[in-house]
Amino acid sequence: MKKAVAFFAVMLIVLSVFSQNLFSFANNVSPHESKEKEYPEVLERFSVFKASKVEKRIREAEEARKRELERLLSEEKKRKRIEQTLSNIKNGKTSLRKVFANTCFVGDSLINGLETYNILNSDKIISQVSARFSHLEDNIKKIISLNPKVLILHYGINMLWFDDTGLGWFIDDYSELVKKLKKQLPHTRIIVSGIFPVNEEVATDGIFIRVPDHNLAIEKMCKEIGVEFLDSTELVLGCKEYYGSDGIHFSASFYSEKWLPFIVENKGIIG
């Protein structure tokens, strides 16, 4: 029994000395110093990783800033060219024929006016009085063969009479033809014009109240397909004096003084 007590006492003394030494060591060495001494390579790699990550973010920010600056400069340059083109048209220094030399206009009698009044080159105008989508379908091969830089379509007003059942068939047919053109002309800018509103005196006819809904549907179609939409509504409503006697078609000056410069300004077509 005495031996056991003596052994137990010795063990307590040993444990006490060990604990004091351990506590002293812990006080003299911080946790960070301990970790640094134990894992120097890991800490070094982590520091390099953090530095490279920061450098990467700085490079990305600089590249993004550079791209944004280039975009702004490009837009400013384009805006000045558009302004210069509009000024040259107004002053007679350049012709509409030259500006739209690489643009093909396709559509109904409202497009036909460009040829009737001899405003643009007839070889880039494909139009027909009272044209419907069948006209566009019949001329797809011809349009593709021209391979224009820009293609502007205007259809719809002649289908208002036959649209009692809603917009479904109208958009389905139009969409199918535009998709076909986009596939066959991958490098051509395709611009779909909304239907021109009619003179307010004619607008009382029931069929013409459908124009705004049709234009909204055409605009939505353009977004879904990935082509451009041209909304001339505000322009036309401000040009009442340019309507013909029927309140639907326009005078020559509407095209030369209003609509074509409007396209230059809003779509950046400068030749």
Where are these regions (language model features)?
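Catalytic His-Asp segment of secreted/periplasmic serine-dependent ester chemistry enzymes
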Residues: 18, 22, 198-271
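Conserved, well-ordered alpha-helix/loop/beta-strand core segments that scaffold catalytic motifs
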Residues: 152-156, 179, 191
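N-terminal secretory targeting modules
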Residues: 1-100, 116, 270-271
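Conserved SGNH/GDSL esterase-like catalytic core that processes O-acyl groups on lipids
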Residues: 87-173
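Second-shell loop/turn segments in exported
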Residues: 127-129, 159-168, 181, 203-208, ...
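Charged helix-capping and loop-helix junction motifs
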Residues: 167-177, 208-214
